[in-house]
Amino acid sequence: MVGSSDGDQSDDSSHFERGVDHIYEAFICPLTKEVMHDPVTLENGRTFEREAIEKWFKECRDSGRPPSCPLTSQELTSTDVSASIALRNTIEEWRSRNDAAKLDIARQSLFLGNAETDILQALMHVRQICRTIRSNRHGVRNSQLIHMIIDMLKSTSHRVRYKALQTLQVVVEGDDESKAIVAEGDTVRTLVKFLSHEPSKGREAAVSLLFELSKSEALCEKIGSIHGALILLVGLTSSNSENVSIVEKADRTLENMERSEEIVRQMASYGRLQPLLGKLLEGSPETKLSMASFLGELPLNNDVKVLVAQTVGSSLVDLMRSGDMPQREAALKALNKISSFEGSAKVLISKGILPPLIKDLFYVGPNNLPIRLKEVSATILANIVNIGYDFDKATLVSENRVENLLHLISNTGPAIQCKLLEVLVGLTSCPKTVPKVVYAIKTSGAIISLVQFIEVRENDDLRLASIKLLHNLSPFMSEELAKALCGTAGQLGSLVAIISEKTPITEEQAAAAGLLAELPDRDLGLTQEMLEVGAFEKIISKVFGIRQGDIKGMRFVNPFLEGLVRILARITFVFNKEARAINFCREHDVASLFLHLLQSNGQDNIQMVSAMALENLSLESIKLTRMPDPPPVNYCGSIFSCVRKPHVVNGLCKIHQGICSLRETFCLVEGGAVEKLVALLDHENVKVVEAALAALSSLLEDGLDVEKGVKILDEADGIRHILNVLRENRTERLTRRAVWMVERILRIEDIAREVAEEQSLSAALVDAFQNADFRTRQIAENALKHIDKIPNFSSIFPNIA
């Protein structure tokens, strides 16, 4: 017909075709210029297409004109029309003859070897016939023309394939029998292939035909069974195609196919999840069970987990509460899947998951969950508590709940034990909940049983969870943990073995190192136990390996290294009671290592611990310094010894007046550590400054030549920095240490005179004199005397015997 969407020619062109009857003028409507379908006659005998003349009469009424004949302009007394039945029958007979002729022409033309123009014209005739009179589709089916059109999909011409697709769509519209014929063989597979291999117009025609076929429920299964069909259709709906029609038709095709639960599951696998969620919300109990079960097996990205939790979270929680065990199992597995992301876990909490979850976990009695499902419940609970949620007001951290958790850990198998330990890991990671967990563990004495998990070898996840939990507990239960580790054979050695494993750095190694690092550093028994198991040799080997780049594992390297350094530093706290500690530090040049670690920029704790260790090492220097042997005295020398000049020994330590080295006597001066420690006095972390200041103060201790110590500090520009620390008054502890050092520095008269007029220094000392603790006030008073801010009464009033 004229004006069709694919550019088909009108019927009046068909008279050029062989075997096609001429169009008689009486068949043509004067208004539409087309062959009439429903001719009617006016009172003046003129004949028009019914729809066209009715439209004409309406225009007359709307414009206020009397009805008239559009051909003669003659006014009519009535708008009544009479059907021209004889003419209509004649036209139908004529059309039937022509349609039969055109179909015959089409059958002769639809061969791949024919000219493209003949094929295109034949396809056009078929479309015209189907659009003109729907009953003629029966003729198309009987002529087996559909199969001939399908063959045109094999053409090498894009245009022929495109027109063949359009023709098939017209043929099957509203005709299930034609759809069934088209779906025979590999036609649907070909259409699916066209979705990705054809140009845009061809893809649009292919998806439009698939949409028509999908209106038949029987063919939905056929389409869904074609490999790649669903994933391509889903891909088209989510594409940014400029052809909106392709996206729309693909979407509507998938909507038609949602009647099949199997196809819905496949769609979900390819990312189209809403149909599955819809059935989970509104389906029958059997359907809900099926959808929930599949959801529990489906890989989901984090954004989708949030969507699922928001959409069906409440429904899944309701299923979990039901008395039907298969439904509870399906719901638990789905909730386990979507609770593993922080965003979705928070949504589930808002949907009320905690009360039934806790009930399922702890309940014993009728309809009790089997152990395998309790494991799933424990996993969900572990997922939820490890997102950092504020459980302060939740019943989960009540004393009774924590005790139940500890009891359950002691009375279940490894799988559930692991998940319950992960629950406690999450609770002890939260500042608000950790005190309650610590209290419950202390009062129940559970630390002994928790420590035993360190030795588990057949379940890596269980061991990791236990070590992470103990690491979280260690700042609050360090003494109890140290006692437990020393009191039971094997656990300490197991921790050391984990730390020393020759693998890329793991989370377990970092947690184990962090756990040992938190234990009391002055616990002699623990340090001796570590010496017995060779822990320090293994620790220092790991530290060297990390610094030299031999040990990999970027994710956990910083916490692991920090833990190792803190463990290693503990050996410097037992010099007075354990001779092996001195020997170890000498043999492994520990002082040099800590000196290098001072420069670990960005790792404040490592710098702080290294400075603390250097302080401890430096305090031993005076005991370890070797005095030079006196020169041999001969007979003449003994006679004239009273007039002989004193023997001068070169190379002696400036501060210890003996033979020193960093390795053998831990001397900060000989090791060049003073400048590096002074540099840390400008650190923004006050704890690093405190540790560096304490290490430097070891050069001014009683028993040393304070004047020489001050000179060494001055040469390293340390005095200026120490005075600045006092002026800044950042913390009470730092001020106390700075006042002690400044008082000793001001004993040197030249320095005292130089800084006496500095108002800021005087003000800082006065503030300490007035507000500090008793001991610091006394020291500040002495410092103020050195700069004549307080009179020295002992020099005014001589002692009276």
Swiss-Prot record:
E.C. designation(s): 2.3.2.27
Source domain of life: Eukaryota
The protein's enzyme class: transferase
Catalytic activity entry: S-ubiquitinyl-[E2 ubiquitin-conjugating enzyme]-L-cysteine + [acceptor protein]-L-lysine = [E2 ubiquitin-conjugating enzyme]-L-cysteine + N(6)-ubiquitinyl-[acceptor protein]-L-lysine
Keyword ATP-binding: no
Pfam families xrefs: Arm, U-box
Biological source species: Arabidopsis thaliana
The name this protein goes by in its record: U-box domain-containing protein 44
Residue windows of the ARM repeats: 134-173, 176-215, 218-259, 261-300, 301-340, 342-386, 390-429, 435-475, 480-521
